[in-house]
């Protein structure tokens, strides 16, 4: 770094509001990039994402050291299960999973992107290949539903009609625990 740039960088770091900005944390797994603002939100999401006995057994095979590792292990297992349930195995499948504190944050993000007010606890953004989900309202079935949308989106070259998309996501949600 040149001597000229260092004072500029130091000045920018001292500006009010810049030093205290919240940085999103990101971690990647085989199928997902996990984004969240703070560890408390991630812990709540993890606690709400209760797995049944079969799915829990699969986590034991993973190298889990942190809460983020556990969440990513759960997400990868759910994705694989949804792909089996739908019998759809898209190539190059990767999504972004954005965990926010509550449904008001999901609604705020949706309003900003699409200009509509909604009361969703989660949604899948087709254009971003991203799932936005409330940590407060998270559950295995809610996440499986949104992953169902993402698997269908990645699988077909031409997107199926919305009603078909929704039926497949509901099917994934219902059968994720089979």
Q: Model-derived features: where do they sit?
A:
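Bacterial N-terminal signal peptides that target proteins for export
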Residues: 1-8
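Post-HExxH zinc-binding segment in Zn-dependent metallohydrolases
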Residues: 159-178
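Active-site recognition of the HExxH zinc-binding catalytic motif
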Residues: 141-154
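Bacterial N-terminal signal peptides
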Residues: 9-17
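Acidic/histidine-rich, surface-exposed loop or edge segments in extracytoplasmic proteins
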Residues: 28-66, 151
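Soluble non-cytosolic domains of exported or imported proteins
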Residues: 62-76, 134-142, 158-163
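Auxiliary, metal-adjacent structural segments of Zn-dependent hydrolase domains
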Residues: 65-127
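Boundary at the C-terminal end of the N-terminal hydrophobic targeting segment
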Residues: 19-24
């Amino acid at each position: 770094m040149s001597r000229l740039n260092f004072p500029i960088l130091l000045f920018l770091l001292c500006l009010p509001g810049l030093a205290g900005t919240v940085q999103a944390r990101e971690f990647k797994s085989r199928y997902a990039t996990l984004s969240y603002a703070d560890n408390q939100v991630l812990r709540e999401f993890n606690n709400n994402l209760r797995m049944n006995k079969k799915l829990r057994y699969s986590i034991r095979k993973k190298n889990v050291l942190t809460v983020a590792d556990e969440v990513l292990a759960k997400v990868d297992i759910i994705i694989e299960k949804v792909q089996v349930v739908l019998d759809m195995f898209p190539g190059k499948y990767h999504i972004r999973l954005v965990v926010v504190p509550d449904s008001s944050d999901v609604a705020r993000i949706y309003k900003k992107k699409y200009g509509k007010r909604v009361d969703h606890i989660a949604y899948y953004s087709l254009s971003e290949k991203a799932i936005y989900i409330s940590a407060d309202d998270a559950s295995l079935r809610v996440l499986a539903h949104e992953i169902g949308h993402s698997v269908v989106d990645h699988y077909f070259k031409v997107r199926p009609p919305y009603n078909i998309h929704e039926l497949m996501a509901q099917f994934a949600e219902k059968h994720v625990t089979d």
